[in-house]
């Protein structure tokens, strides 16, 4: 492509990728990235500041566009120049996916946070306060039931004494045999 036939307005509308494609096509040899950038700046009439502002996006576009290939050492060429068998790109072996282990079901449901009451919210509900007071009264009434517990303790002591007597009689019977 001859850029002399285009007007300056038409050249400004050309993308950097289109210019690189035609430059590489005219040269018919791989070129370093820095040389490509210099030629683009010359053809499009870009200042160094404009080039610096666009260089990152240009490099990204160059990598993404399937028409170009990086030959190493920052040299770029057209992919159409190289048959697939000749391309000496670094090919990394793909790791084999690991086999998934069968997870045993534990029988428990997963904890769902939605069911949990939000105790941090204050809604001004007085009914809850009444429930707490009722529970306090019930607990006070249960405190007086300690007498029943004492009776149970005495029953356990009596049972333990009977058990000891039984063990002694068993031992005597075994000795007689």
From Swiss-Prot:
GO BP term (any one): DNA-templated transcription
Listed GO MF terms: DNA-directed RNA polymerase activity
Compositionally biased residues, Acidic residues: 106-177
Span list, region Disordered: 93-177
Domain of life: Bacteria
Swiss-Prot/TrEMBL keywords: DNA-directed RNA polymerase, Nucleotidyltransferase, Transcription, Transferase
GO cellular component: DNA-directed RNA polymerase complex
Domain HTH HARE-type: 14-81
Pfam families, sorted: HARE-HTH
Known role: Participates in both the initiation and recycling phases of transcription. In the presence of the delta subunit, RNAP displays an increased specificity of transcription, a decreased affinity for nucleic acids, and an increased efficiency of RNA synthesis because of enhanced recycling.
Assembly with partners or alone: RNAP is composed of a core of 2 alpha, a beta and a beta' subunits. The core is associated with a delta subunit and one of several sigma factors.
Entries under HAMAP family matching the protein: RNApol_bact_RpoE
Family: Belongs to the RpoE family.
Name of the protein in question: Probable DNA-directed RNA polymerase subunit delta
Organism: Bacillus cereus (strain ATCC 10987 / NRS 248)
Lineage: Bacteria, Bacillati, Bacillota, Bacilli, Bacillales
Gene that encodes it: rpoE
């Amino acid at each position: 492509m001859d850029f002399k036939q285009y007007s300056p307005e038409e050249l400004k509308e050309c993308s950097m990728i289109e210019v690189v494609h035609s430059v590489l096509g005219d040269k018919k040899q791989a070129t370093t990235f820095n040389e490509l950038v210099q030629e683009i700046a010359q053809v499009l009439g870009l200042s160094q500041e404009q080039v610096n502002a666009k260089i990152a996006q240009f490099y990204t576009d160059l990598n993404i566009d399937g028409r170009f290939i990086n030959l190493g050492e920052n040299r770029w060429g057209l992919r159409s120049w190289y048959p697939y068998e000749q391309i000496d790109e670094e090919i990394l072996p793909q790791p084999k996916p690991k086999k998934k282990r069968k997870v045993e079901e534990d029988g428990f449901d997963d904890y769902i946070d939605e069911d949990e009451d939000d105790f941090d919210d204050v809604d001004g509900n007085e009914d809850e306060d009444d429930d707490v007071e009722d529970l306090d009264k019930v607990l006070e009434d249960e405190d007086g039931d300690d007498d029943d517990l004492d009776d149970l303790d005495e029953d356990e002591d009596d049972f333990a004494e009977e058990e000891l007597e039984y063990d002694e009689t068993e031992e005597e019977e075994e000795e007689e045999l």
